[in-house]
């Protein structure tokens, strides 16, 4: 997009907002109880609603008012500086190869023309392809890729459509790629577009979306839905928390995730469906505990809320892709939290490793747009699950055969075996 065309592009979200204002879309801010101050992130987090009484919200009247942010000028110079590394840091990127199948696949994706982003479309892939451009920029320093990322960030603001019609799953799947791309391109250095994107993220995380799947904010979905909806919402929520520097909500989100993995003492406020795949129906969890059995069959590591999508318990299980789909959101949550200092990959006796071991035990390997997951899981655990390269990107993440493939290979002989 040419620079002189940007002011016109910015008018469309504004005109849409004016039109939608007459419909009074509901914007709900999910209250967040204050959590105790700690010197480091905790492996066990503060109980939340569903696991005990939440502390009341106390307004900090002494907090200074935020300084006004400058108006966005699309023709202003674009600064380039080191970025924070929500997903990868500069020193990590510098070690990654610029040759091989994974790199060539990433480069081809970065050079692919993109249609306008549509966050209201749960199958839109603009987010992961914009992430490809950001990764190539961060590795090569080629400014045209950064310019393309900034164009994409500019275009996505307002692409969520009418909250009364947009579904929360679409929003959750599409947001992480944009957030991480913005971090890789050091969008915060932009005096106008940077603050504009931050304000938009604040709006996205507090807006109630009423489309298919129910009416939720990102945090409300994360704390209620123990299936793929909730895991994707958690990934988007955590990515935004990290980008905005919201440590309080980050800790709350970590607590919810730990509860989903199986620590009901941390959080147990989810609403589950049929419990026929739960090892302990009276105390349902997102991932069955180690050694769990149903009718004499080992179901430790199974995702009950997704396994039931193919029907009540039976053996062998009827195949469903929902288990891998839920893991797309879960492994992104774990990686983001791990980089922020939370030992999320280790929680509940390495629950995510056990989940993948269960799927391999019943011969359900990652296929299609789940192919990126084994690279990340192998890197996290030093495991050796089958991993394909070039790997297809997923609904909320991709390119891990390049970003994490080297780590996977280095750790394969030193960590957990894929068979347990």
What annotation goes with each model-predicted range?
Residues 22-71, 75:
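Ser/Thr-rich, Proline-interspersed low-complexity disordered segments
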Residues 247:
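Active-site neighborhood of glycoside hydrolase catalytic domains
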Residues 293-317:
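Intrinsically disordered, low-complexity acidic Ser/Thr-rich regulatory segments
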Residues 58-59, 63-225, 231, 235-236, ...:
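Extracellular glycan-targeting catalytic surfaces
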Residues 17-19:
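C-terminal motif of bacterial Sec signal peptides marking the signal peptidase cleavage site
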């Amino acid at each position: 997009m040419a620079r002189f065309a940007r002011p016109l592009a910015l008018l469309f979200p504004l005109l849409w907002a004016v039109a939608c204002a007459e419909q009074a879309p509901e914007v709900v801010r999910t209250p967040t109880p204050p959590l105790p101050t700690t010197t480091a992130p905790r492996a066990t987090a503060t109980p939340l609603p569903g696991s005990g009484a939440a502390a009341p919200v106390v307004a900090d009247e002494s907090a200074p008012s935020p300084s006004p942010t400058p108006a966005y000028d699309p023709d202003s110079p674009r600064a380039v500086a080191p970025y924070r590394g929500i997903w990868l840091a500069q020193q990590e990127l510098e070690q990654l190869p610029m040759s091989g199948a994974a790199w060539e696949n990433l480069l081809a994706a970065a050079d692919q023309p993109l249609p306008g982003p549509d966050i209201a479309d749960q199958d839109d892939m603009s987010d992961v392809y914009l992430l490809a451009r950001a990764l190539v920029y961060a590795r090569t320093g080629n400014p045209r890729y950064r310019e393309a990322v900034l164009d994409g960030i500019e275009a996505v603001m307002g692409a969520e459509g009418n909250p009364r019609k947009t579904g929360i799953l679409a929003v959750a799947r599409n947001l992480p790629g944009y957030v991480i791309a913005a971090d890789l391109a050091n969008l915060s250095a932009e005096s106008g577009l940077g603050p504009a994107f931050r304000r938009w993220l604040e709006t996205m995380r507090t807006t109630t979306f009423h489309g298919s799947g129910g009416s939720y904010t990102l945090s409300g979905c994360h704390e209620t839905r123990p299936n793929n909806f909730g895991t994707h919402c958690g990934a988007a929520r955590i990515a935004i928390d990290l980008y905005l520097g919201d440590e309080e909500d980050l800790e709350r989100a970590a607590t919810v995730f730990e509860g989903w993995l199986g620590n009901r003492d941390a959080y147990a406020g989810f609403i589950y469906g049929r419990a026929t795949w739960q090892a302990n129906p009276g105390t349902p969890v997102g991932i069955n505990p180690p050694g769990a059995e149903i009718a004499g069959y080992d179901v430790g590591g199974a995702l009950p809320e997704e396994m039931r999508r193919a029907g009540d318990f039976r053996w062998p299980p009827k195949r469903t892709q929902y288990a891998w789909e839920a893991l797309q959101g879960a492994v992104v949550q774990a990686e983001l939290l791990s980089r922020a200092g939370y030992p999320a990959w280790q929680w509940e006796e390495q629950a995510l490793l056990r989940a993948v071991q269960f799927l391999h035990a019943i011969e359900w390997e990652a296929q299609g747009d789940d192919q990126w997951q084994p690279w990340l899981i192998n890197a996290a655990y030093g495991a050796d699950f089958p991993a394909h390269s070039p790997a297809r990107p997923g609904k909320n993440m991709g390119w891990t055969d390049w970003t994490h493939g080297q780590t996977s290979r280095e750790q394969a002989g030193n960590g957990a075996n894929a068979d347990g």
